[in-house]
């Protein structure tokens, strides 16, 4: 999940080595308001901060599990664990951008596990958000929501999240082979 989420976030957040002001805080790296040092300490971004891509990667790797925990708290462990990893990556990107899954309609959609409903709700529930932003920023955010929705919509079930264990798959495969051999024997 983390690798897929990193890829999505890097694509849409972009990298900035220098701190910049964004809405309510200084940001740096991949849109983060924090800097994580190699010893694990974390601090807020300040006006003249500069970081490397490696430092930004470290901060992003620390933050993604935090956003995952926020989502799990909002939708429940059972609902979250049933989602395919690719869908989780799209939802982590959304939460990273908004801070959480604030819309009840989206939380409710996630709890159903219906990927099409989740994707449609993600796009429609945020369509009129950010009305105060410039048209180019609104367009970029809409494109991001569409991309996240497509990730969710096209996600393939994880074997475990689909409720199928490796033991079940192997058992079914062995049963199919045995049945095939048995049917050949009966025909002979």
Where are these regions (language model features)?
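Long, amphipathic alpha-helical surface segments
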Residues: 3-8, 12-15, 32-35, 54-57, ...
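Structural recognition of the beta-strand scaffold that forms the well-ordered cores
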Residues: 27-29, 90-95, 117-122
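Alpha-helical scaffolds flanking conserved acidic
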Residues: 2-6, 82-92, 117
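Catalytic glycan-binding domains that act on GlcNAc-containing polysaccharides
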Residues: 16-23, 82
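Short, exposed beta-strand/loop patches in secreted or surface proteins that constitute
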Residues: 17-19, 48, 110
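Short, low-complexity, charged amphipathic interaction modules
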Residues: 165-187
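Substrate-binding/active-site groove segments that recognize
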Residues: 22-45, 65
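Alpha-helical segment that forms one wall of the substrate-binding/catalytic cleft
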Residues: 42-78, 85-89, 93-105
């Amino acid at each position: 999940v983390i690798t897929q989420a990193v890829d999505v976030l890097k694509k849409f957040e972009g990298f900035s080595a220098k701190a910049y002001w964004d809405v309510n805080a200084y940001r740096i790296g991949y849109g983060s308001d924090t800097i994580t040092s190699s010893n694990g300490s974390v601090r807020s971004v300040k006006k003249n901060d500069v970081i490397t891509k490696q430092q930004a990667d470290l901060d992003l790797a620390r933050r993604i599990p935090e956003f995952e925990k926020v989502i799990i708290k909002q939708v429940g462990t059972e609902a979250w664990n049933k989602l395919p990893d690719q869908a989780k990556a799209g939802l982590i990107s959304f939460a990273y951008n908004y801070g959480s899954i604030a819309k009840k309609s989206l939380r409710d959609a996630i709890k159903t596990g219906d990927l099409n409903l989740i994707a449609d709700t993600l796009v429609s529930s945020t369509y009129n958000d950010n009305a105060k932003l410039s048209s180019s920023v609104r367009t970029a955010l809409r494109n991001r929501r569409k991309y996240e929705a497509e990730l969710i919509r096209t996600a393939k079930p994880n074997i475990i999240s689909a409720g199928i264990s490796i033991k079940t798959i192997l058992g079914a495969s062995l049963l199919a082979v045995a049945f095939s051999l048995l049917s050949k024997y009966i025909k002979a």
